[in-house]
Amino acid sequence: MGVDIRHNKDRKVHRTEPKSQDIYLRLLVKLYRFLARRSDAPFNKVVLKRLFMSKTNRPPLALSRLIRKMKLQGRENKIAVVVGTITDDVRILNIPKLKVCALRVTAGARRRILKAGGQVMTFDQLAVTTPKGQGTVLLSGPRKAREVYRHFGKAPGTPHSHTKPYIRSKGRKFERARGRRASRGYKN
């Protein structure tokens, strides 16, 4: 007798709407859904997809990284578009004139961008200015920068693994001897 095929893992998971009940986000989704359908520009489709994403997949972008990415050749006078938050970076002293569009900009970052003669736009303003995303640079924050990613990967304690172990304490007695120093068995 044959065994029937398991259908419990068949589903390909992709969001068709945001999980959030935020009415302002839902209005943006309505707008970009219209633009993605009516224009052939891939920009609108990408923005729409990113509006659906969870918060961990929309990591914050620091002002320093934004400046570094906008300094690249051919990106002057373009609008930096971030589907997420732009955060301030106190390590940066001189800020160039920037034109940015983001879901959220922290108070410090907003103040410094405007002080430098820049401009902060919302996504509905962007849709009016560039409905097809002409003259824009789509940026996103570092997704793997979260602390939890340090624990992922090859099991801690195996050769050539740099994975951070989950331990209750960082004391001398906790995962610091065997495999960490040559005098105690071996060193990775």
Curated annotation (Swiss-Prot):
Primary localization class, coarse: cytoplasm
Subcellular location per the Swiss-Prot or TrEMBL entry: Cytoplasm, Cytosol; Cytoplasm; Rough endoplasmic reticulum
Keywords tagged on the record: Cytoplasm, Endoplasmic reticulum, Ribonucleoprotein, Ribosomal protein
Domain of life: Eukaryota
GO CC aspect terms: cytosolic large ribosomal subunit; rough endoplasmic reticulum
GO MF annotation: an example: structural constituent of ribosome
Region feature (Disordered): 153-188
Compositionally biased region (Basic residues): 161-171, 178-188
InterPro entries documented for this protein: Ribosomal_eL18, Ribosomal_eL18/eL18-A/B/_CS, Ribosomal_uL15/eL18, Ribosomal_uL15/eL18_sf
Gene Ontology biological process terms, A to Z: cytoplasmic translation
Family matches, as Pfam families: Ribosomal_L18 (PF17135)
Similarity comment text for this entry: Belongs to the eukaryotic ribosomal protein eL18 family.
Function: Component of the large ribosomal subunit. The ribosome is a large ribonucleoprotein complex responsible for the synthesis of proteins in the cell.
Subunit details: Component of the large ribosomal subunit.
Name assigned to this protein: Large ribosomal subunit protein eL18
Organism: Ictalurus punctatus
Gene label: rpl18
